Amino acid sequence: MIARLTGMLAHKSPDAIIIDVNGVGYRVQIPFSTYYELPDEGKTVSLSIYTHVKEDAISLFGFRTVAEKEFFQVLISVSGIGPKMARDILSNIQPDELAGAILQGNLVRLSSIPGIGKKTAERLVLELKEKVRKMDVAPSTKEAAPSEAPPEVADDVASALVNLGYKEAVVRKVLAEMAIESGASTEAVLRQALKILMK
């Protein structure tokens, strides 16, 4: 069972990266919050890994922080939530804000996450409130500050957001209305687009 990978960051995209470890490339799925913290391609990266084993496949999920990995493992303990949905949840909300929403029973905030309906939000609160209370995560409702982004990253951002469950027409409309500055990063576009989409 792989618990951590350290190697060269051979490739990165908003939802997955490839880590080269002694000539072997490992594809690791990641949440946006981990993507924001990645070094440039060619640099060394080290991630905590959750290994998901199925009959026909092994999938790796990587996290920069222990809190993210712990929350991921707690999320997949909820009935109806698999690894991909758990990853997508953490792409849309920081662990501290998620903890706050669960502890406060904030169904409106939880159900605003793509793929999470009212019933799933209720299950999150019902099944995780006590677990979250015991976790070492300070609840918060703080939101990340928005940034502006260049048009050349729009396709990557749109693809990532569609994979998270947003409708492409809505995503494209939001991206078209965002102010454009050359030199802004993909991470900045994702942050701003998510902030607008979750209003």
Swiss-Prot record:
Q: Where is this region: Flexible linker?
A: 144-154
Q: Which GO terms describe its molecular function?
A: ATP binding; four-way junction DNA binding; four-way junction helicase activity
What GO biological process terms are annotated to this protein in UniProt? DNA recombination; DNA repair
Q: Which GO terms describe its cellular component?
A: cytoplasm; Holliday junction helicase complex; Holliday junction resolvase complex
Region listing for Domain I, in residue ranges: 1-64
| Species whose genome carries this gene | Geobacter metallireducens (strain ATCC 53774 / DSM 7210 / GS-15)
Recite the UniProt keywords alphabetically. Cytoplasm, DNA damage, DNA recombination, DNA repair, DNA-binding
What is the protein name for this chain?
Holliday junction branch migration complex subunit RuvA
Tell where it localizes. Answer: Cytoplasm
User: Record's NCBIfam families?
Assistant: ruvA
The record ties this protein, via Pfam families, to: HHH_5, RuvA_C, RuvA_N
Subunit record text: Homotetramer. Forms an RuvA(8)-RuvB(12)-Holliday junction (HJ) complex. HJ DNA is sandwiched between 2 RuvA tetramers; dsDNA enters through RuvA and exits via RuvB. An RuvB hexamer assembles on each DNA strand where it exits the tetramer. Each RuvB hexamer is contacted by two RuvA subunits (via domain III) on 2 adjacent RuvB subunits; this complex drives branch migration. In the full resolvosome a probable DNA-RuvA(4)-RuvB(12)-RuvC(2) complex forms which resolves the HJ.
Which residue intervals make up region (Domain III)? 154-199
| Key word Cell inner membrane present | no
Function of the molecule: The RuvA-RuvB-RuvC complex processes Holliday junction (HJ) DNA during genetic recombination and DNA repair, while the RuvA-RuvB complex plays an important role in the rescue of blocked DNA replication forks via replication fork reversal (RFR). RuvA specifically binds to HJ cruciform DNA, conferring on it an open structure. The RuvB hexamer acts as an ATP-dependent pump, pulling dsDNA into and through the RuvAB complex. HJ branch migration allows RuvC to scan DNA until it finds its consensus sequence, where it cleaves and resolves the cruciform DNA.
Read off the CDD domains from this record: UBA_RuvA_C (cd14332)
Family annotation (HAMAP family): DNA_HJ_migration_RuvA
Q: What is known of its domains?
A: Has three domains with a flexible linker between the domains II and III and assumes an 'L' shape. Domain III is highly mobile and contacts RuvB.
The highest taxon in the source lineage is Bacteria
**What is the similarity comment for this entry?**
Belongs to the RuvA family.
Q: Where is the stretch described as Domain II?
A: 65-143
